[in-house]
Amino acid sequence: MQVELIIKNLNVYNSYFKKFIKGDILINKGKFLHIGKGYEDRLWSENVIDGEGKYIIPGLIDIHMHIESSMTIPREFSKAAIKHGVTTVVADPHEIANVFGIRGIEEFIKFKGNLDIFYGIPSSVPSTSSSLETTGEKITHNEVKRLLEYDNIICLGEVMNFKDLIEDDDSNINKIINISKEKNIPLEGHCPKIQGVDLSLYIYRGVNGDHTQQSVGSLQEKIQNGMFIEMQHKSMTLENIKFLIENNLYEHFALVTDDVMADKLVKGHLDEILKEAVKLGMSIENAIYASTYTPARRMNLLDRGTIAPGKLADFILLDSIEDFNIYEVYKNGEMVFNRDKGLKEEFFEDKSKLDYRFYNSIELNNITKESLEVKVPNKYKNKVNCRTMKVLKNTTFTEEGEVTLNVYNNILQWEKSSCALIAVFERYGKNNNISFGLVEGEIIKEGAIATTWAHDHHNLMVMGRNISDMTIAANEVINSRGGYVVSKNNEVIAKLELPIGGIISDEPIEIIGEKLGEVRSAMRDLGYNHMNEIMSFSTLSLPVSPALKITDKGLIDVKKGSIVSLFK
């Protein structure tokens, strides 16, 4: 029997024994046909390659990520990710859903990349409720029914609305979960700092996966209660990895990326998380297992994730396993990336364009300096105690603080304080909301930052040390149809345009990455000190991430799930 491809003399990763075994691989019709030896008198090919002792592993599978986090479209994401050995992803498009609703999800699904992109249904759009944040659209149980008909929808995306989930049987999120259960798909969670009975109630509803930041304690409690853990970068600590190794928990977690910024994507993706696990003490064999086999099983992708007869021939050839140096990447038995030759461009032939309406979504006039004046109620005379959001250096969580500020003519005098002012402007043309907050910590010491890439509602958010720079930065974002802008001394010093929904661009990923790198550098130059400046700032607006956040409706006490006043 003739087969399409034979690669000889390889060290083949075997998922079942978690070790490398010397042998050959035979591929036919995009799938592995035979692994090993003893085939010569029965199977042959006109296309035989000498593997020269290279290491072959399954293509990497990332089961929790957001393409919009890379600020790009599926085609450009595919081209970038496949260079890093990623051949399958499960994307939760809840960012585009918050802006455009089901129309955005369906457009994203049609707007193909050429690695396998499966999707989770955004379950929490908005992330909380319309009483706490304004979004462009909503996803209800009716839209979920429609989306479940798509073949490449394979799970329910992260369930963030914890309060409604456990307190209201008739809530939209419980209706969504009940519909999803009928399809027997995985239900993905988002449950940071939820524990005890609250965690049990959360799991009882059927949500049994979590990707949020973990500690040893949360890992133990969640896994022993049946949760599958998705380990992203901020959970990759020495203590966490040691706990997983010592307790032999390899069947209960996978490595994922969640959010990879464009400037980071050009350098690495899931391969970087894998290498980080190895640096922290995990064997390369087990790190590969957690990046291929367990994620495939979690998402019922039983046709991939291992090198075995009948499985998809998605694989990576490595020069060595010590440095995880990728030589080639194959998709469905076809070489799509070579380290020396680059991408096989014809593999990425999709040239479709988004509808023009996706490029004009900012319904907001230019703001004025007067609109940034914080008016104080008459009952406060010369001074007022204010809540603050304290930015923490190594997490996207905040702490609530307090500061006493002067009041003059009912206007808050904040510019000479230790705090920056933050404001959120509703951008969908629905209610013209404006809210204010105060931010402290190792943030900018001068200038301003503005963005519509503000999780998850993606309204216009601006933070600064003076009203003039805040106005300039915010208006530059509006005039760019969305984006990220940094200003200083009344000038724009860095800018990334994101005209699609105010959150993504269709420029090549290298250009997006370069511009985002300039924004990141400018934020650092202004004094922002954080492990990920972009995510730190952009999640100040995320009302499901502890402890005090801001939306267009006001300051949100995340634990209570309620609006609290800036003034105490």
From Swiss-Prot:
User: Which Cys pairs are S-S linked?
Assistant: none
Q: Which cofactor does it need?
A: Mn(2+)
Q: Does the keyword Manganese apply?
A: yes
A Gene Ontology molecular function term for this protein is: adenine deaminase activity
Q: What is its EC number?
A: 3.5.4.2
Q: List the keywords (alphabetical).
A: Hydrolase, Manganese
Which top-rank group of organisms is this from?
Bacteria
SUPFAM superfamilies reported for this sequence:
Composite domain of metallo-dependent hydrolases, Metallo-dependent hydrolases
A GO biological process held by the record: adenine catabolic process
Question: Catalysed reaction per UniProt?
Answer: adenine + H2O + H(+) = hypoxanthine + NH4(+)
The entry sums up its family as follows: Belongs to the metallo-dependent hydrolases superfamily. Adenine deaminase family.
Name by which UniProt lists this protein:
Adenine deaminase
Q: What organism does this protein naturally occur in?
A: Clostridium perfringens (strain ATCC 13124 / DSM 756 / JCM 1290 / NCIMB 6125 / NCTC 8237 / Type A)
- The gene name on file is ade
